[in-house]
């Protein structure tokens, strides 16, 4: 992430029951970003048994923080599961990708956060750059 007066890294790890890899992914990114010069104040971590409402609330809180920035950088890393709707689509141009949170049926869209919702909730100011790395 380029040097900026305003910078923030968001690390989201969303394992399903019995999975530990997502925690390791988030910890590895946290350690790497600290080693690259970010302070712990520049890092926000959300991980564990997450659900749709918690993730959207987290993103809304971030939005309220960065909405006053005239410029800056936000890095968003997610480690978890993904899906797309409709699940039976045969054309990549007709699908909508999503992140899957919570326990239970991965095919339940009520547990999904669509990427359009992520970007809409963050609603970054025009001169705030977003770097995105989804691992799902």
Language model regions located:
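Short glycine-rich His-centered loop
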Residues: 2-18
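Caspase-like (clan CD) cysteine peptidase catalytic core
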Residues: 6, 56-79, 83-136
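Hydrophobic/aromatic beta-strand patches that form the interior of the parallel beta-sheet core
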Residues: 8-12, 44, 131-133
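Cofactor-binding loop segments of dinucleotide-utilizing enzymes, especially the Rossmann-like FAD-
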Residues: 12-16, 48, 79, 135
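Second-shell loop/turn segments in exported
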Residues: 15-20, 44-48, 105
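Glycine- and acidic-residue-enriched helix-capping/strand-helix junction motifs
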Residues: 15-31
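Solvent-exposed, acidic/flexible segments
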Residues: 19-22, 52, 111
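Functional beta-strand-loop-alpha-helix junction segments that form "active/interaction loops"
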Residues: 30-72
């Amino acid at each position: 992430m380029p040097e900026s007066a305003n910078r923030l890294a968001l690390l989201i790890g969303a394992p399903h029951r019995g999975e530990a890899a997502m925690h390791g992914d988030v910890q590895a990114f946290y350690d790497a970003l600290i080693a690259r010069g970010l302070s712990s104040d520049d890092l926000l971590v959300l991980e564990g048994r997450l659900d749709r409402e918690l993730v959207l609330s987290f993103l809304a809180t971030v939005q309220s923080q960065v909405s006053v920035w005239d410029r800056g950088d936000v890095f968003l890393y997610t480690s978890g599961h993904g899906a797309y709707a409709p699940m039976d689509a045969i054309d990549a141009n007709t699908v909508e990708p999503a992140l899957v949170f919570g326990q239970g049926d991965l095919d339940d869209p009520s547990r999904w956060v669509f990427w359009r919702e992520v970007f809409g909730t963050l609603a970054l100011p025009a001169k705030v750059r977003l770097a995105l790395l989804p691992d799902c």
